[in-house]
UniProtKB/Swiss-Prot annotation:
Record's protein name: Movement protein
The protein's role, per its UniProt record: Transports viral genome to neighboring plant cells directly through plasmosdesmata, without any budding. The movement protein allows efficient cell to cell propagation, by bypassing the host cell wall barrier. Forms a ribonucleoprotein complex with viral RNA. Binds microtubules and modulates microtubule stability. Can bind double-stranded DNA.
Record carries keyword DNA repair: no
Positions of the UniProt region annotated as Disordered: 212-266
Biased composition (Basic residues): 212-227
């Protein structure tokens, strides 16, 4: 039987629990459980896509508690023949954050000639159980230079996370372990550029543009509806006795105060 991505993940690579947390029953310690999520999968069909990803799939949460996203392992498989050109940038996003540079948890770049790849992130921050149920994470995928017909899937991505479920938001004993990564290691560091594939545009900038495009389309639809409504309501009958309609031009003072902070590279 083949080894799955979930089976290759070791909790000790991401966190150290105190002896107290390891020995004592769950009701006597702040840490309720340490879990490895089941694998969530995304098929990257479009060159640019922003998709929801369930990083806590299969994890039982505590009511009115917290969950710490201690670590994340992402595995990618190119569904292409050997020696194809192009590559991909993969970015993990916290969609709760409005500023794009703060929403990006980490990015990774891989060429298409590398048949498969894996990388890990250590977000190491907690959110409430209520927020976790809203599935707050996304993945931004930017495939560049891969010549494939539309409708086919050049890349498959799998995600598995290590998380700590706790009743109180206290991080004592949840220390992050920094690992040394060598050339022979199967898992590589965040933002490491492999071979000669270099992404010219930072992923935070890509996320900002992607969000602006979505908001721009939404505003355009709303503006069109408003213009159609005004053209009907602004027509009034001329009281001078002459035939015809008098059209009053009413200035639209609705302004969009929404501002998006400019993103910067990190």
């Amino acid at each position: 039987m083949a080894v799955s991505l979930r089976d290759t993940v070791k909790i000790s690579e991401f966190i150290n629990l105190s002896k107290q947390d390891e020995i004592l029953p769950a009701f006597m310690t702040k840490v309720k459980s340490v879990r490895i999520s089941t694998v969530d999968k995304i098929m990257a069909v479009k060159n640019d896509s922003l998709s929801d990803v369930d990083l806590l799939k299969g994890v039982k949460l505590v009511k009115n508690g917290y969950v710490c996203l201690a670590g994340l392992v992402v595995s990618g498989e190119w569904n292409l023949p050997d020696n194809c050109r192009g590559g991909v940038s993969v970015c993990i996003v916290d969609k709760r954050m409005k500023r794009s540079n703060e929403a990006t948890l980490g990015a990774y770049h891989a060429p298409a000639c590398k048949k498969n790849f894996s990388f890990k992130l250590i977000p190491n921050y907690s959110i409430t159980s209520e927020d976790a149920e809203k599935n707050p994470w996304q993945v931004l995928v930017n495939i560049k230079g891969v010549a494939m017909e539309e409708g086919y899937c050049p890349l498959s991505l799998e995600f598995v996370s290590i998380c700590v479920v706790h009743k109180n938001n206290v991080k004592k004993g949840l220390r992050e372990r920094i690992l040394r990564v060598t050339d022979d290691s199967p898992i590589e560091l965040t933002e490491k550029v492999v071979e000669e594939f270099v992404d010219e545009v930072p992923m935070a900038v890509k996320l900002e543009r992607f969000r602006k495009t979505k908001k721009g389309k939404k505003r355009k639809k709303e503006k069109k509806k408003r213009v159609v409504g005004n053209s009907v309501n602004n027509k009034k009958i001329n009281n001078s006795g002459k035939k015809g309609l008098k059209v009053e031009e009413i200035e639209d003072n609705v302004s969009d105060d929404e501002s998006i902070a400019s993103s910067s590279t990190f």
